[in-house]
Regions:
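C-terminal motif of bacterial Sec signal peptides marking the signal peptidase cleavage site
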Residues: 5-8
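Leucine-rich, highly hydrophobic segment in Treponema pallidum outer-membrane-associated proteins
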Residues: 11-12, 147, 154-281, 422-486
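N-terminal mature-domain "stem" immediately C-terminal to a signal peptide or N-terminal signal-anchor/transmembrane
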Residues: 12-59
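A short, Trp-centered hydrophobic/proline-enriched beta-strand micro-motif
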Residues: 23-35, 86, 276-281, 323
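Single conserved position on a long alpha-helix in the C-terminal lobe of the eukaryotic protein kinase
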Residues: 27-28, 70-177, 321-426, 443, ...
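Short, solvent-exposed loop/turn elements at domain surfaces
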Residues: 35-41, 197-200, 287-290
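Surface-exposed, low-hydrophobicity interaction/linker segments
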Residues: 39-82, 102, 296-323, 363-366
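Extended non-catalytic domains of envelope/secretory-pathway proteins
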Residues: 257-342, 350-356
């Protein structure tokens, strides 16, 4: 019986992979059975159950995508021996999910009740549409997809049917994809970078935005083949691994060899601990300025009125180490509004000409009507009613804008954060505040191809539950409107 169960599980997962088109831009595989076991999310009868703390978070954030998805998954009767697959197809749907269910009729009843809509037979499959979301059930497999743009029900149903009936070449035929998805982790993801190149090329809005920020084309135009990410829950948190897949002599690796500098955590001496997010990349400014994308970005800034005295070109040339940014949500700021001008922010860069850069910035501020006021050894200015602290510490030029006085410690005194950035030329750190306590995520690349990271929490509790509670609080959405298709 155990052997039969193993073969059955393997068979259904193979079938699901055969439904995912080979030209998908990305695929995520979730080991449902492992996540349920580690999260203790099943009762004695094997039914999916959630602890009260998770239910409370989902209730308070019921419009968040993960909350909605988990509410549905708990009720529809998923096959817990099968994986869940999410993928980004090339056409029609912007993203999609494949889920094996125990009883298709029961699953349909749950979806109809939750959506207020009714299934109908279109293109010989059971189809239900709720706003921009399509549900298709065929032979105990549930397809959920969000339309890329508003389309006729018949086209949506026919496209989903093509996936479910394995009408296309699939990822199952590509060993480079399945090798990554089959690693023994709770979550595996494979991102086809070249597929995103095509998506950007076919999107007028993305193309226009890249013209405004040419530095981003360093990544969007790279010849990386793929990026893989792997996550595994452990007793006290979760571990991550990431890999860049590319040819040894690819232009992207040559670019990194020329522009990356040695990892250095000294910038943390000027990043206040009130910052919730930190990103750092160590670069050689002289080589960086030789790139067309960087020159174009610097020229855009240099052509702004009154900025010639700052000499951005020499600023970039002088960088020899980390460029870092820290962010935290200001009072009254919606975290989903990234462009909000009231975020607290800290910018730092290691420079061979730090003192001269500070002098130029002070002179520029004076020209703009900002007097030079010194407080605790830092230059203090005001921007939109918020204090801005600026200075040079150990060759690190920094500017810190806060909605409060700078009376706090800095991240350099935190060993776990310091160890991450001292070993990784490219690093990321996040601090997430919850009612139970704070949770942390740090991640970095120590070389051109291999990255790793950890998720951990300061409060006791199951890390799977903690992680799900955080996801359930992200990106609350209003009811779908036609504008959300575009």
């Amino acid at each position: 019986m155990l052997m039969l169960s193993m073969f059955s599980c393997t068979d259904i997962n193979k079938q699901l992979e055969e439904m995912i088109p080979a030209d998908s831009r990305g695929v995520v595989r979730i080991d449902v059975k492992s996540v349920i076991e580690k999260g203790q999310l099943a009762d004695e009868d094997g039914n999916v159950v959630f602890p009260q703390s998770l239910k409370d978070v989902m209730s308070k954030n019921e419009s968040a995508p993960v909350s909605e998805a988990m509410t549905l998954l708990r009720k529809i009767g998923i096959d817990t021996d099968a994986n869940i697959y999410c993928f980004v197809p090339k056409n029609t749907f912007s993203y999609a999910t494949l889920i094996a269910v125990n009883d298709a009729d029961e699953a349909k009843k749950v979806i109809e009740k939750q959506s207020g809509q009714k299934f109908q037979t279109i293109e010989k499959v059971d189809f239900l549409r709720n706003g921009a979301i399509s549900y298709v059930i065929d032979d105990d497999i549930l397809f959920i997809g969000k339309e890329a743009k508003e389309d006729a029900d018949s086209k949506l149903a026919l496209t989903a049917k093509g996936y479910l009936h394995k009408s296309n070449a699939s990822i199952a035929e590509d060993a480079s994809i399945t090798e990554s998805l089959h690693k023994e982790n709770d979550v595996n993801a494979y991102i086809n970078v070249s597929g995103f190149h095509n998506m950007i090329a076919n999107s007028e809005s993305l193309t226009e935005n890249l013209k405004k920020f040419p530095i981003l084309t360093l990544f969007t135009d790279s010849d990386i083949k793929a990026f893989t990410l792997h996550m595994n829950f452990e007793k006290e948190g979760a571990k991550f691994e990431a890999y860049v897949k590319a040819d040894d002599n690819c232009d992207y690796f040559k670019l990194l060899d020329a522009t990356m500098a040695k990892a250095d955590a000294s910038f943390l001496k000027v990043i206040p601990i009130s910052m919730n997010y930190i990103f750092s990349m160590s670069v050689n400014g002289e080589n960086l300025m030789k790139l067309d994308q960087i020159r174009k970005s610097v020229n855009l800034i240099s052509n702004l009125p009154s900025t010639d005295m700052l000499d951005f070109r020499s600023m970039v040339n002088s960088i020899d180490g980390p460029i870092a940014i820290g962010l935290s949500v200001g009072n009254g700021v919606n975290i989903s509004s990234v462009a909000n001008d009231n975020w607290n922010i800290a910018i730092a860069a290691k420079s061979k000409d730090a003192a001269a850069i500070v002098e130029r910035i002070v002179a520029f501020a004076a020209k703009m009507g900002q007097p030079d006021y010194i407080k605790d050894g830092r230059h203090l200015f005001t921007y939109q009613g918020m204090p801005v602290y600026m200075g040079n510490q150990d060759s690190i030029v920094y500017a810190i804008r806060l909605d409060h006085e700078l009376e706090e410690d800095f991240y350099y005194d935190m060993p776990d954060v310091r160890e991450r950035f001292v070993s990784c030329p490219l690093g990321v750190y996040a601090k997430i505040s919850e009612p139970q306590g704070e949770s942390y995520f740090n991640f970095g690349f120590k070389n051109k191809t291999d990255g790793d990271g950890v998720f951990y929490s300061m409060h006791e509790g199951n890390p799977v539950i903690t992680f799900l509670e955080i996801l359930c609080q992200l990106n609350k959405t209003e009811q779908t409107t036609q504008q959300q298709y575009y």
